[in-house]
Amino acid sequence: LVLWIDVLMGEMNFTDFTDFGYVSEDSLWGGLTKEAHRGYMTRCLELAERGWGRVSPNPMVGAVLVRGGEVVAEGWHAYFGGAHAERMLFEGLGDVGDLSDCILYVSLEPCAHFGKTPPCANLILGKGVGKVVVGVLDPNPMVSGRGVALLRAAGVTVLEGVLEEECRHLNWSFWVNQVLGRTAVVAKWAETADGFMGFVKDERVLISGEESGLWVHNLRAGVDAILVGVNTWNIDRPKLNVRGIEVSKQPIRIVLDRNGRGEYTSEGLSRSEGELWVVGGDLNLSELLKWFYEAQGLGVILLEGGASILQSFVDADCVDDIHILRNSQMKLGAGIKSPNLDRAILKRDQDFGADEHWIWQRDFGGIGSGTEEGERAE
């Protein structure tokens, strides 16, 4: 027997990690090392990403079944309302005999409640899988540890927290939905090196480059709706759609038009560009986002301007993910200033040509980080 020893608050807690080979870097279980476990979870994340833009407001999930260091089957949640990752995996498994010697890796805790599909935890038990590795626990109050508890109660060995941060990050918008009870918000804008988004007068200026444009369309492909203010709608006549990337449906276009000043032509109303919602009246942004999520099922929306709309969401603490494309080679000298926020929170990501990419994302800390009694990867 090999024990993992934790010393906390003056007490020693002993947890048996022998079954999973998590005692030391070179320990083995079934020929698998820590890095092997992480490698299979990385594959789960790769599979999960295939649901990008297709499963919202559900989370993206991937699953891999391994026997003796070999992948037996894979699955992922492919579209909203469709089979969950675990069910897809088992449906494509074929006859491979007893599964008690297999490890099932899944990026998100198996569900334990009836939704559009039956509980995956029950399915796993019915298949007789002996061991399960979970990336991160589900923040959904209807799950939130119940899935792994159900598995453990039936004698399945469960390990939590393999690539936990990566698994949580993949579905950051789902965490917003479940923890804050509202639609998640991505804010994206382009700015010049001297901090301007455009001219004051009603004319367009192209700030970001072609490489950024390709990235923006991939970002749009992953959201449920794109929101702009009425000034941006009237002046820029934006298409607010996805181009150059195959999508199952175009994002909904939302215009915030408090006083009915929008110019809605037949071209703008074309459904081929996506549904158009015009939202007017005295708006409370927090309540609006709750309505978007609870009544309309929008998991995540993208803010694309203008500056006053972006600033209002920032000031209301209703932005969860920020992407700034800063053209380092362009200055306007005057014009519409970029939203005011604490730039110290931003981190530089991969640049696109001359465009610097600065990002920030809301931190949910340890939410979904594991049960107190659970065996965890370190």
Describe the role of every protein-language-model region.
Residues 54-55, 82, 148, 162-190:
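Proteins enriched for Cys/Gly/acidic motifs involved in redox and nucleic-acid/cofactor modification
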Residues 144-148, 170-174, 238-241, 334-336:
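Short secondary-structure transition/capping segments
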Residues 65-166, 252, 312-314:
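Zn2+-dependent cytidine deaminase-like catalytic core
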Residues 102-112, 180-191:
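N-terminal pre-triad scaffold of radical SAM enzymes
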Residues 1-6, 13-23:
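Short, low-complexity, charge-dense intrinsically disordered segments
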Residues 10, 21-59, 74, 93-94, ...:
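Enzymes that bind and transform nitrogen-containing heteroaromatic metabolites
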Residues 62:
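Helix-turn-helix
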